Amino acid sequence: KRGYQFVATVKAVAEPSTTAPNAVTVPEESAPATFVGRGSVLSELAACLDKALSGTRQFLCVTGEAGIGKSTLVDAFQDHASRYPDVRQARGQCVEGFGGKETYYPLLEALGQMVRGPRAAEVVEVLASQAPTWLIQFPALLKAEQREDLQRQILGATRERMVREICEALEVLTANSPLVLVLEDMHWVDPSTLDVLSALARRRGRAKLLMLLTYRPVEVILLNSPLKALKQELVVHRLCREFNLERLNEADVSAYLKAEAAGAELPAGLAKLVHDHSEGNPLFMAAIVRELQESGAIVIDDGGWRLTKPLDEIDLGVQDTLQQMLELQVDQMNEAERQIL
């Protein structure tokens, strides 16, 4: 067995000393104050984490339109998972234009966090013994002679070997220590990363592994991504669960506004105005509230919010956030689709 010594400095992160309970519950403080309308989904994700902690791997997809709150939900879930000291977490993200240019981009980003984070030495040792084709992707962590040794080991390595090695490495790492692996914006994923995820989801061995993917279904269709077929096949075989985020209702918007107003009473009709104009999209909702504040339509008075003009005189127009998102979607269309629009 070879020992691998770090070249780069690894900063340790202190971990809680409390032990994890057998059952996972979601306390109210798991989510930020402005986290609304997603409590039931968060509870289901927590239940999936409970299964992963018991050794049953979980493959989950959180889907929804742009601005619907996928990343906010993931943040809240990771905050919940961080309360368990044995749970290791890593997060990678696909980047528009990188799918097909840099193979395994989101996985390498997540692994990069693991080889530099808490218990990094263990991760490097496992990669050295189980997945040298992946360890070589982080040359800054190795001495020159170690890099040369790895290069000899992986000479002639195939894509199939890389898939097998990372699956085996993650299973070794999660045999006793749970891992939450989050990969975002998977509508831009590269085919090689999908091969790894497909293999991880289908393998039957025990693993304390929870994989959580986020993506926009419309983008998957527009880009003709193979992710759609993979997800459907895994769902059919009960190897994947999908959580599609719906738009917020008026009660959710009201709860958000009250949280922003520190619990103060809201002007009559304000929640309906914001809900109607945002159509329940959390990103647009937040943008509308900012515009109301910046334009002076809402002011803080005696600790609460007060309208400076009647609701029917407030002209919200099209928020910059919405306009930019629409422009991006139009830019992605081909000429025929633009003509139809």
List PLM regions with ranges.
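Key residue(s) within conserved catalytic/signature motifs
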Residues: 4, 22-341
